[in-house]
Regions:
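Terminal peptide-recognition signature
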Residues: 25, 33, 61, 105
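Conserved PDZ fold ligand-binding element
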Residues: 27-45
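Radical SAM enzyme core and accessory elements
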Residues: 9, 15, 286-302
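PDZ-domain C-terminal substructure recognizer with occasional recognition of PDZ-binding tails
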Residues: 51-87
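Short, small-residue-biased leader/transition segments that mark boundaries at the very start
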Residues: 1-8, 304
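Flexible glycine/acidic-rich beta-alpha junction loops that bind and position SAM and/or redox cofactors
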Residues: 204, 224-250, 270-294
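Conserved Radical SAM active-site core
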Residues: 70, 77-223, 233-262
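Short, structured beta-strand/loop micro-motifs enriched in basic residues and often containing a Trp
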Residues: 13-21, 41-44
Length: 304
């Protein structure tokens, strides 16, 4: 351990909130309130950078202590071992908000008077990797794609809604939403594992439109390893919002037959069921839920 005076122009600082007992950080006498300045003389843009730079057997950390001293710490560790700290901001950067105005958005349908954080609409690929959030790709830049492919951050969970570009623009109320589908090609070619989701809206992206979407999405299997289909959720707080209808039993049974037909195709072709109807469809149809083996290990579930 060496004290070091160092000036990095425009360096990003990351405040350490907690040090885990028995961790590398505790052994190095890193404490809550210390600040991580760099790893291997590289500034850390966000949690992607942090994880990528920490994946090595030898790393050099620059830490600023609470008293203002800067410590340069040379660490020898197992390749996959983490430092063992929690940062004040888990993303180590600002959260990216959603640029869409989806006709089915559940946040727009929430009652007033709840805590402020519940009304924040995120659409951040980093949260997709870290927490399983679904992203629309509309605010994902080429730089973001390059980093995801470079760091091989998998899986990325994508909200497709439809593979019809014009319809996707309408559903997301974003004129770039159709063009954003081209980013799926880059993720696929970069061998980035994906899961997909379709929020089904009656008379909009169901039936024939869904058939078209599943046909297009099946071309990305098995890199795209699952597509979950969920019915749009409608609340009583819909004043001024796009008029949407609830599905009925007949709709649910049609959807399930459509899904099961595609499952047979995909099992034969790739050995996975690929497309999954959420529990709501089976309950609405009056059917028993499928056996566990049909879910391919529950790839579509969000694990936090």
């Amino acid at each position: 351990r060496r004290q070091r005076q160092m000036c990095i122009r425009d360096r990003v600082e990351h405040l350490i909130k907690e040090v885990y007992p028995g961790s590398i950080a505790e052994e190095l006498e890193i404490e809550p309130g210390d600040v991580l300045l760099s790893i291997n003389d590289q500034s850390i843009e966000d949690v992607f950078d942090y994880r990528y730079l920490m994946n090595d057997e030898f790393v050099t950390l620059l830490i600023r202590k609470k008293n203002g001293e800067e410590w340069e710490l040379e660490v020898e560790k197992e390749y996959e071992d983490d430092l063992g700290v929690e940062f004040e901001n888990s993303l180590m950067d600002e959260y990216r908000s959603c640029s869409n105005h989806c006709i089915f958005c559940f946040i727009d349908q929430m009652p007033p008077g709840m805590r402020e954080t519940l009304y924040f609409k995120d659409d951040d690929s980093r949260l997709s990797f870290l927490q399983g959030n679904y992203v629309t790709l509309t605010n994902m830049s080429d730089y973001d794609l390059d980093r995801i492919i470079k760091f091989h951050l998998s899986p990325i969970n994508v909200s497709f809604q439809t593979m019809n570009p014009k319809l996707r623009c309408k559903m997301l109320h974003n004129r770039f939403a159709g063009d954003a589908l081209a980013k799926v090609d880059r993720l696929y070619k970069g061998d980035v594992t994906m899961n997909g989701q379709i929020v089904l809206c009656k008379g909009i992206n169901d039936r024939d439109e869904l058939e078209y979407s599943l046909e297009k999405l099946s071309e990305y299997a098995p890199v795209l390893q699952s597509v979950s289909i969920v019915p749009v959720g409608l609340s009583r707080y819909r004043k001024g919002l796009y008029p949407l209808e609830s599905f009925d039993k007949e709709d649910a049974r049609y959807l399930i037959s459509q899904v099961e037909r595609w499952q047979k195709i995909m099992v034969k072709k790739h050995g996975i069921h690929f497309v999954h109807a959420s529990d709501e469809w089976y309950i609405l149809a009056g059917y028993e839920l499928p056996e566990e083996g049909r879910y391919d290990g529950y790839l579509s579930l969000i694990h936090i």
